Amino acid sequence: MKKRLVSILLVLVMVLGMFPTVAAAADAPTEITSAEEFATMPASGDYILKADIIITAPYGNNFSGTFDGDGHTVTLDITGTANYVGMFKNLTGAAGKTVTVKNVILAGKIDAASRGNVGGIAGFANPYSGPIKIENCKNTATIIAKEKVGGILGSCQSDAN
């Protein structure tokens, strides 16, 4: 009986040892540590920047997630050949979620001299489907554009409702 109990206990320990003892929280943001990770992050996730990065192109088309710069610097080195230029091309409101960009320090330069909708955080913000919040962001970058230009946003569409 004693051998059987020890055997069962040993099997139980071996089986439980196959499972990780520490699991990441399901709602923990994905860490971004490079420009490559920034450029390829899915548009609707939750992210936290864990290192200073240099970006040479805006992020995709429509960002609808949460981005926490965590006090890190994003150096912009962008020459715009199209409209909608910034760290993000567009921030697009999402139903049931507040799109948020916070705690970002911007440096560097955006040169889109013949273009419009150019801003440090985003070229354009459209809160039509849900709210957009930008908080505790600082821009020391030089931004050159033809029209609809701003230190944080190039332009913002008002809610149709």
What are these regions (language model features)?
Residues L16-A24:
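C-terminal segment of classical bacterial N-terminal signal peptides
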